[in-house]
């Protein structure tokens, strides 16, 4: 096997991408109102918010049992067909920075047993 390879990619079937997507969990750590608004937007809809623990919640009661809830949600999303599978794929990403430069990236599978840095 190669160190970097294609893999089956799971993409959301979500009709409301505003509810599905949230910013990275390490952002807005001192702004709980952002996360409250994200929760309200997601409500009972499938959301990546249900698949992570925002750092803003790390030292709160919300962190208690979060790993189990997240794992349960992952299993439920798989069972309910929340995702569509794009087989044997890579994802190419472009992001334009505030200064106009473009960063490019590739999402791929990485065989950590083969990788040596």
Features from the language model and the residues they span:
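A cross-family signal for N-terminal binding/gating loops and helix N-caps
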Residues: 1-116
């Amino acid at each position: 096997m190669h160190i970097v390879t294609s893999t089956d990619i799971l993409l959301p079937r979500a009709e409301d991408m505003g509810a599905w997507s949230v910013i990275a969990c390490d952002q807005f750590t001192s702004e709980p109102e952002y996360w409250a608004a994200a929760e309200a937007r997601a409500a009972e809809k499938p959301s990546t918010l249900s698949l992570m623990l925002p750092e803003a919640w790390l030292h709160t009661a919300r962190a208690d049992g979060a790993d189990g809830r997240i794992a349960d949600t992952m299993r439920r999303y798989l069972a309910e067909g929340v995702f569509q599978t794009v087989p044997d794929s890579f994802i190419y990403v472009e992001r334009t920075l505030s200064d106009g430069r473009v960063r490019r990236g590739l999402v791929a599978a990485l065989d950590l047993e083969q990788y040596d840095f």
